[in-house]
């Protein structure tokens, strides 16, 4: 069975589930060892699961079979949003340069080549994917060979580097090894992965020799479009509020866990959350309402993991809606509304406690209403971080009151990332955000 290394705020819940699904847990933290009574195993993982930057999900990376199996079991349990890269990290292929800074990868997809590399249009060479394509973003490939193993990575950069998870004391041992037993490989290009700190010199030397033989074989090339070596599969997994509640249940089977634990952990709560768990206090709604005061950051998370942050000040809290005032940077035009963003233009954002939408209404510096933008998303999570997953379709209303549906084609393009329950998003029409909350009447001005 596959070996999994799991880190982050979802570690206990996902470790419990992974064990149920037959995974072996490797390189566990001491806390996970204690909670599950595990025997420490420091062998390299087949899959690594770690926090996404938004703390509203995880990133999975590893051998494709292990990643696919983990995603399928996770899909069955929590029904999350899943975006899997269409190419692997360190896929090695024969690419044809088709334009300035672009190379054609297997399947015809185009990837960007960093400007520091000089490539001639029409030429072919061996390329390695260093940033896989995700959602609307192109991948990045370089005219280098990268051959990654469990412990090491051989490459053609001519440098020796180390995972940031290897401490300086351990780096000293590996640096000496790179200058002696691995000297020939280090002169080509060598990177020590985090698992290298647990490996013996003989294990490292054996893998380096195997990777070198594979690199020689790859360097012989092939016809354009050939995939010479499969890299690691990567996927972004995002949890909405419903999915987080399911993960709360999984964690509760191991240690005391209140409803809303993972949502609150994503707000940055530490020891005080441990206390609430121990006391068994059902305080999620009150806690997030308390946290949503003063300055907040709205995390607008795209299904493929892109995070757009909007900062503002809470001007009103009621039982069912939060009102945030956000200054806008001058310049440009409000999409779907047509009004110019002048100095002093601001938005009032209404965040309902339930309902799959957020309402952004826009005002001039003097408080004159300009129009409204309704974002359709998962149920928002309150707190000092207001978090939701964008479901890609939006509505806009100008001063004429005409409803304009935006980005419906984007939903169609990326619907496969969404679970079935989220593929037909709806939002009420005619909603406007004012300093007092949601209304359907056109305001003449606002003093917020």
From Swiss-Prot:
It comes from the Archaea. Coiled coil: none annotated. It is an enzyme of class 3 (hydrolase). Keywords: Endonuclease, Hydrolase, Nuclease, RNA-binding, rRNA processing. Its EC number is 3.1.26.-. The keyword Nuclease applies. GO terms for molecular function: mRNA 3'-UTR AU-rich region binding; RNA endonuclease activity, producing 5'-phosphomonoesters. Residues 436-448 have a biased composition (Polar residues). The keyword Membrane does not apply. It holds the Pfam family DUF402. GO terms for biological process: rRNA processing. InterPro entries: DUF402 (IPR007295), FomD-like_sf (IPR035930), Ntdp-like (IPR050212), RNA-bd_FAU-1 (IPR016730). Residues 426-448 are annotated as: Disordered. Belongs to the FAU-1 family. PANTHER family: PTHR39159, UPF0374 PROTEIN YGAC. Probable RNase involved in rRNA stability through maturation and/or degradation of precursor rRNAs. Binds to RNA in loop regions with AU-rich sequences. This is Probable ribonuclease FAU-1. It comes from Pyrobaculum islandicum (strain DSM 4184 / JCM 9189 / GEO3).
């Amino acid at each position: 069975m596959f070996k999994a290394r799991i880190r982050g705020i979802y570690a206990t819940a996902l470790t419990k589930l992974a064990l149920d699904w037959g995974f072996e847990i490797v390189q566990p933290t001491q806390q996970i060892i204690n909670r599950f009574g595990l025997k420490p195993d420091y062998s390299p993982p087949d899959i690594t699961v770690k926090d996404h930057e938004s703390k509203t999900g995880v990133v999975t990376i590893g051998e494709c079979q292990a990643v696919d199996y983990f995603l399928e079991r996770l899909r069955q349990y929590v029904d999350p949003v899943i975006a899997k890269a269409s190419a692997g990290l360190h896929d090695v292929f024969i690419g044809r340069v088709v334009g300035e800074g672009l190379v054609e990868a297997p399947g015809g997809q185009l990837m960007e080549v960093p400007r520091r590399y000089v490539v001639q249009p029409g030429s072919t060479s061996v390329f390695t994917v260093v940033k896989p394509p995700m959602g609307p973003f192109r991948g990045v490939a370089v005219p280098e060979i990268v051959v990654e193993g469990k412990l090491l990575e051989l490459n053609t950069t001519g440098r020796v580097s180390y995972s940031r998870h290897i401490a300086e004391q351990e780096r000293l041992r590996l640096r000496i090894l790179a200058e002696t037993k691995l000297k020939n490989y280090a002169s080509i290009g060598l990177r020590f992965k985090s698992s290298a700190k647990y490996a013996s010199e003989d294990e490292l030397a054996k893998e380096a020799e195997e990777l070198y033989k594979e690199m020689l074989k790859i360097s012989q090339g092939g016809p354009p479009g050939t995939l010479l070596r499969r890299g690691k599969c990567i996927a972004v997994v995002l949890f909405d509020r419903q999915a987080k509640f399911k993960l709360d249940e999984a964690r509760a089977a191991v240690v005391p866990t209140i409803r809303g634990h993972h949502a609150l952990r994503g707000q940055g709560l530490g020891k005080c959350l441990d206390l609430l768990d121990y006391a068994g206090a059902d305080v999620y709604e009150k806690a997030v309402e308390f946290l949503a005061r003063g300055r907040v950051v709205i995390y607008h998370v795209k299904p493929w993991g892109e995070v757009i942050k909007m900062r503002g000040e809470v001007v009103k809290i009621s039982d069912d809606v939060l009102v945030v005032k956000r200054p806008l940077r001058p310049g440009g035009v409000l999409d779907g509304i047509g009004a110019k963003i002048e100095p002093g233009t601001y938005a009032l954002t209404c965040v309902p406690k339930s309902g799959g939408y957020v309402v952004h209404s826009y005002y001039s510096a003097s408080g004159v209403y300009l129009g409204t933008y309704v974002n359709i998303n998962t149920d928002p999570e309150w707190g000092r971080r207001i978090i939701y997953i964008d479901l890609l379709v939006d509505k806009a209303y100008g001063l004429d009151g005409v409803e304009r549906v935006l980005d419906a084609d984007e939903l169609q393009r990326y619907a496969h990332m969404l679970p079935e329950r989220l593929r037909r998003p709806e939002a009420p029409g005619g909603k406007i955000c004012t300093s007092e909350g949601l209304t359907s009447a056109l305001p003449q001005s606002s003093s917020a």
